[in-house]
């Protein structure tokens, strides 16, 4: 038991020490080339972590700082995956203020810092969800698609409708009435071609096929 506790202690100690920024021995007089480019943007105070990648070789780290809170994220491949817990604490502390992000890169055993960039945190929360159609790039695999919703405070995604339930046909052109998630319409093509109207728990289908169109909606 003592050995187990000692190992746990070492793991915790290592986690704390690895979260500290390294000593900086030089400055790079330019902003880091990051993707996506979040430089100078304003974000809602409940947005999911803004993970990003930096175009540089070797070890890198990013130091996130606001009044009252700071943490460091390390990356061996230049891609930063920001921990949810640290990010949420940062946004709470930075509400109505800004976050400074310093990217450091290691060269020959010494760390150099790019010029910092900033993200402003709004006092307004983000809308809970965004809805979208998900389909493979280029539309080659159009027979595998669906309409999904993602929680914007996280990366949780769940289907509203997947076309595997409708004979793998095309589903498109969805919209909501005045941003009301309880009032929605979308179009279905091919075998079950129609417009689907959703009003709370009431669902209605409309056949818009005419003699002058090749199918419903077209």
Where are these regions (language model features)?
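Sec-dependent N-terminal signal peptides
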Residues: 4-13
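Sequence signature of WD/YWTD-type beta-propeller architectures
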Residues: 16-218
């Amino acid at each position: 038991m003592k050995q187990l506790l000692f190992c746990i202690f070492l793991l915790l100690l290592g986690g704390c020490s690895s979260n500290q920024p390294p000593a900086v021995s030089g400055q790079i007089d330019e902003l880091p080339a990051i993707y996506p480019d979040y430089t100078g943007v304003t974000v809602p105070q409940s947005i999911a972590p803004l993970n990003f990648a930096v175009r540089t070789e070797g070890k890198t780290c990013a130091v996130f700082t606001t009044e009252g809170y700071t943490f460091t994220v390390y990356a061996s491949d230049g891609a930063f995956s920001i921990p949810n817990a640290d990010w949420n604490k940062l946004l709470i502390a930075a509400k109505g203020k800004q976050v400074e992000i310093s990217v450091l890169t290691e060269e020959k055993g010494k760390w150099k810092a790019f010029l910092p960039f900033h993200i402003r945190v709004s006092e307004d929360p983000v809308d809970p969800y965004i809805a979208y159609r998900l389909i493979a790039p280029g539309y080659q695999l159009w027979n595998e698609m669906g309409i999904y919703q993602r929680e914007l405070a996280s990366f949780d995604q769940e289907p509203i409708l997947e076309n595997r339930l409708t004979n793998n046909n095309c589903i498109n052109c969805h919209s909501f009435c005045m941003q009301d998630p309880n009032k929605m319409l979308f179009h279905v093509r091919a075998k079950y071609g129609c417009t689907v109207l959703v009003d709370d728990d009431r669902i209605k289908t409309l056949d818009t096929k005419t003699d002058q169109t090749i199918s419903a909606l077209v």
